[in-house]
């Protein structure tokens, strides 16, 4: 079996085009463009690349993008003060604080300071709790982007045995909630899981997010499985690869995401969707 490639780059561009059309319609109707504030503390090179891609995407769809590049020496109190000001700014619909933050700043305290209606990353405990209770509002971007990919490829997830490898707050845990909503029987594996191979071999839908190149051998993949590889790993030779051995896995899977060009573009596209949602549902003047 040769797997069909799930083209995240193309789907992400479709999503961004749809958002851009809605923004144009808003402006034509006399409404303001959505606003996203992107906050970067320090000069982590990887973070700078991610932030640049998010700002570029904002501008492409017609959002108002506000950048806050703060020095490494910024204190937690100064960062919280900025978030308070952005929470109170009626022209800002989304606040994104790029992680990781420098030592000495409490990630949890910072993320919880963002108002849930402006939490376009979907990391605030309120938004995660809404997802757990089957009443989602703003959803974590990577898991939601994966669901969008499955939907756009008309993949029926109801009744599938889904296995998530990795239990991070950003991907694994919220992904398990999205899969339950999508009708899957869901297993989450992690560093303490025994006999990982057994779980992988029984997965109809496999989502891998551990950040280790080639962590899952291709011959573990069940025939006809759907494989979603969230890993983005740069090797010493400069090549970017996922957590799954792609060439071998593609011989067994029915669908598979490539790295790069699979899940990655969907994370930014979903951030853009979330910002529009925050603007329309929570910040537009509501009809009485």
Swiss-Prot record:
Binding of NADP(+), residues: 166-168, 232
Gene3D superfamilies: Leucine Dehydrogenase, chain A, domain 1, NAD(P)-binding Rossmann-like Domain
Any one annotated GO CC term: cytosol
Pathway annotation from the record: One-carbon metabolism; tetrahydrofolate interconversion
Keyword terms of this UniProt record: Amino-acid biosynthesis, Histidine biosynthesis, Hydrolase, Methionine biosynthesis, Multifunctional enzyme, NADP, One-carbon metabolism, Oxidoreductase, Purine biosynthesis
InterPro entries, sorted: Aminoacid_DH-like_N_sf, NAD(P)-bd_dom_sf, THF_DH/CycHdrlase, THF_DH/CycHdrlase_cat_dom, THF_DH/CycHdrlase_CS, THF_DH/CycHdrlase_NAD-bd_dom
A Pfam family reported for this protein in Swiss-Prot or TrEMBL: THF_DHG_CYH
Gene Ontology terms describing biological process: L-histidine biosynthetic process; methionine biosynthetic process; purine nucleotide biosynthetic process; tetrahydrofolate interconversion
Keyword Oxidoreductase on entry: yes
UniProt-recorded Gene Ontology molecular function terms: methenyltetrahydrofolate cyclohydrolase activity; methylenetetrahydrofolate dehydrogenase (NADP+) activity
Reaction(s) catalysed by this chain's protein: (6R)-5,10-methylene-5,6,7,8-tetrahydrofolate + NADP(+) = (6R)-5,10-methenyltetrahydrofolate + NADPH; (6R)-5,10-methenyltetrahydrofolate + H2O = (6R)-10-formyltetrahydrofolate + H(+)
EC number: 1.5.1.5, 3.5.4.9
Task of the protein: Catalyzes the oxidation of 5,10-methylenetetrahydrofolate to 5,10-methenyltetrahydrofolate and then the hydrolysis of 5,10-methenyltetrahydrofolate to 10-formyltetrahydrofolate.
Assembly and interaction partners: Homodimer.
Family: Belongs to the tetrahydrofolate dehydrogenase/cyclohydrolase family.
Protein name: Bifunctional protein FolD
């Amino acid at each position: 079996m040769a797997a069909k490639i799930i083209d995240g780059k193309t789907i992400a561009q479709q999503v961004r085009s749809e958002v851009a059309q809605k923004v144009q319609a808003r402006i034509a109707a006399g409404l303001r463009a959505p606003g996203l504030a992107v906050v970067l503390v320090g000069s982590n090179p990887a973070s700078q690349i991610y932030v640049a891609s998010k700002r570029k995407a904002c501008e492409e769809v017609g959002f108002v993008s506000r950048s806050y590049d703060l020095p490494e020496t910024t204190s937690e109190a100064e960062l919280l003060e900025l978030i308070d000001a952005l929470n109170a700014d009626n022209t800002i619909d989304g606040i994104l604080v790029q992680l990781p933050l420098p030592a000495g700043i409490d990630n949890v305290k910072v993320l919880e300071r963002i108002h849930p209606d402006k939490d376009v990353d979907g990391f605030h405990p309120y938004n995660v709790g809404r997802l757990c209770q089957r009443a989602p509002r703003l959803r974590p971007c990577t898991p939601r982007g994966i669901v969008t990919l499955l939907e756009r490829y008309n993949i029926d997830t109801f009744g599938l045995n889904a296995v998530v490898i990795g239990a991070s707050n950003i991907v694994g845990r919220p992904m398990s909630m999205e899969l339950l909503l999508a009708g899957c029987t869901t297993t989450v594996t992690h560093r303490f899981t025994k006999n990982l191979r057994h779980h992988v071999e029984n997965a109809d839908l496999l989502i891998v997010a551990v950040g280790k190149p080639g962590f899952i051998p291709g011959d573990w993949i069940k025939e006809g499985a759907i494989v979603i590889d969230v890993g983005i790993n740069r090797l010493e030779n400069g090549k970017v690869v996922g957590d799954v051995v792609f060439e071998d896995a593609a011989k067994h899977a029915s669908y598979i995401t490539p790295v790069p060009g699979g899940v990655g573009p969907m994370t930014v596209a979903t951030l853009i969707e979330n910002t529009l949602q925050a603007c329309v549902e929570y910040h537009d003047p509501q009809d009485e």
